[in-house]
Amino acid sequence: MSSSTDNNKGFEVVIDEGETFNDACLPQLLRLPKQTWPILNAELCERFSYYGIKTVLVIYLTKSLMMSDSDGKAYYHAFSMVSYFTGVLGAMMADSFLGKYKTIIWSLVLYSISEIVLTLTTIPSIGKGNSAGPLIGLFATAVACGNIKPCMAAFGGDQFNQKDTGLISTFFSLFYMSVNVGAMLTMIFVPMIRTDIKCYGSDCYPVVFGVNCIVIILATVSLFLGSPFYVKKEPEGSIMIRVFKIIGHALSRKMKSSEETYHHWLYYAQDKYDKTEIDDVKSLMKVLVMYLPLPVFWALFHQQGSSWTLQATQMDGDFGGGVMLRSDQIQFFNPVLVLILIPAFNIVIYPMFERCRLGLSPLKKMVGGMLLAAVAFAITGFMQIKIQDVQSPPPAPPATMTSVDFINVSPCEVIELNPSSFLKISLPYGQNTGHKIGQSGNRTFKVKGTNCFKKVDFYTNEVTVSLKAGARQTVLLDIADDGMMESTVVDHLFPAVSVTKAHTRVRTFYVPSGNMSDLVHLTYDHVIEKKDSVVVKNFTSYNGTYDFILADEYQLLVRPWNSQNGYNIKLPSENLKLGTFGAYTITLKRPKHQKYSRDLVAHLYEDVDSTSVHRLWQLPQYVVITAGEVMFSVTGLEFAYSQAPPSMKSVLQACWLLTTAFGDLLVVILSVAKPVDGVEKEMFLYGGIMLVVAFIFAVMSYFYTYSDFSGNITTNPADEKEIEESKLNSADSTTHL
């Protein structure tokens, strides 16, 4: 998130000596035209709805529509790209044909319809899991949002008289606050709705999109109810269209004329257009050349909602005590950090450079922002390497040896192997030895079970196990109802994990008592992420293969295959926490000292350590990218507005939107092309591209000559209002993306 508002003089509230803040501000609020309040409410609701979709979008695409991560990223950035491209079209349509009010209200109607389509098609019984319906709804939403983006602030400004500069400043402050409040609220609460409400056995996207749909309908109704009171100005023509006409006419005459020569090709248009207009377009194009490298920054910055969110899905957000930082909720750090870093740069960092006689020009600040973005992606790449540092399974034994893990799955308080031997193994109830290397072949052990069915009893007999050479195996030690000690040998095979998915591996041994069914349905029920439960049907007692499931906290449900009534299960803790890329063994067995029981006790063994990287470790990359945003975006807006004539401000705003759109387009292209394999390599690639572009931009900046338009700026309140509107629109376009 970024904004130029912190440096806008029009946003300052001056409090006379002796006045309290409320004394100074409350009258201003009460004096605002009544028709501005529906506009502010509509803006807050529209921003909430837009970011409510965008915050969860990449997770919805990859986890619900089951797209690959690269395809999910491509569609995410295509959604963003369309909203910024159509922002330019919306501005031209409002200025040339419909006017601002009609453009906004009809776009809100389209917005509402498209979100209804999106909500309905996420319902499994309607959408059938097909991506066509949701994608149509998303595309229409992006078009509607784009049309509104450049119009709402300007329409609000139209409600004031030219002399009400103080009220205009108050309105724009409230407008910017509405944008921020809408975005921040949705980044906090929508992920909670996604995970905490369960419908159709999974994350409740119909409710997520349904809430956003209701909010955008409220925005539409709010704006419509104020219609009788609005000042609705007629379209006056688009300056952007006029710029295109001047450029087109100049190029046409230059190609046709062989006699006339001018020191700049734009002056070929002076037969039809005023020289002042041509000079303004010439100044504009000088700035637009400096815009050419800017899309690369936005290509990196916008991946907070795609690549960084996907990275967060592979990390651990548990703070303990039931407090969870969700993978899409972490995006909230960006707006919070903006509020901290903008004053930090203005009050501390920039003055410190000045005191050291290292003054930073606007272009130098922008280069610094680009370099920080590159550093942020380098951090992201190294973080991905850490996340993907999958731990190895226990070492394989030598060719003539075996590696064995003994587990006590009996109700005995203690099981001892070779109890009279110096090398005896003692296993308390539910405990295991971990993998031990020993001799392979047929091995006979004397096994003693103590306090098995009573608190004072013991059973002893020999068991023979066949241990494979060069293999890892698990030996489960149990006791039969007649008191005979038993053993079951299961191969312990570790399937490789995919580092692109936040999976874990789990195998479960079900060891029932004599009055329980040997064939059951086993369910791993998600606790944190409300995904579809993982159901293993017709599960048998010693099925030792690993299942791949999403890393999460789980409850276990076991019921006989021919019954709806499950067994009571006592877990070792409140839930079973299975970490990313780990490997786990779960045993379900009789309670201690019980021969017959309808209850089961679960024990969890970590066969391979999980890669447990907390989501808070993403905070450094968020701090760096946000610092880069403050240096790049805020300064970029100030640079652009200082280097172009006042008549070209709206064109600069439109072109700023286009740099954002082209940044998204770059991500779409690279996501589809897949020039490198591996997320970490992709992050380093983006960081490398940013470094190269920062160097090119630094060279361009070195040869750039600053212009001074201070003599051309009028103090006409209408002009000041137009500049404030343009700055706010551009700030909105780059702040909450």
Regions picked out by a protein language model, each given a short descriptive name:
Residues 2-454, 461-462, 468-737:
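Hydrophobic transmembrane alpha-helices of multi-pass solute transporters/permeases
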